[in-house]
Amino acid sequence: MAKKSLKVKQAKHQKFNVRNYTRCNHCGRPHAVLKKFGICRLCFRKFAYEGQIPGIKKASW
C-alpha cells in the first residue's frame, strides 16, 4: 500500500508536467495503472472477476 504522504504529494499540481504520474484510485499503486479506468492492473482484475466493471468480461477464443 502506498503511504498517505505519497498520495497527497502526487495529487498536488506539479511545476513540471513530467513529474505528474498516475496512481491507482483504489490502492494507490504507482505502476501499471490503466488510465481509462484509473485503477491498477491488479485492482482491475479483481473488480472484473467480481463483475463490478460494467461491460468487462473474461476473453476466450
Curated annotation (Swiss-Prot):
UniProt entry keywords in alphabetical sequence: Metal-binding, Ribonucleoprotein, Ribosomal protein, RNA-binding, rRNA-binding, Zinc
InterPro entries xrefs: Ribosomal_uS14, Ribosomal_uS14_bact, Ribosomal_uS14_CS, Ribosomal_uS14_sf
Residues that coordinate or bind Zn(2+): 24, 27, 40, 43
Disulphide-bridged cysteine pairs: none
Span of the signal peptide: none
GO molecular function: rRNA binding; structural constituent of ribosome; zinc ion binding
The keyword Transmembrane helix is annotated on this UniProt entry: no
GO CC field: cytoplasm; small ribosomal subunit
Cofactor: how and how many bound: Binds 1 zinc ion per subunit.
UniProt xrefs under PROSITE patterns: RIBOSOMAL_S14 (PS00527)
Coiled-coil intervals: none
Cofactor(s) the protein needs: Zn(2+)
Protein task: Binds 16S rRNA, required for the assembly of 30S particles and may also be responsible for determining the conformation of the 16S rRNA at the A site.
Family: Belongs to the universal ribosomal protein uS14 family. Zinc-binding uS14 subfamily.
PANTHER family: 30S RIBOSOMAL PROTEIN S14, SMALL RIBOSOMAL SUBUNIT PROTEIN US14M
Assembly with partners or alone: Part of the 30S ribosomal subunit. Contacts proteins S3 and S10.
Record protein name field: Small ribosomal subunit protein uS14
Species: Mycoplasma capricolum subsp. capricolum (strain California kid / ATCC 27343 / NCTC 10154)
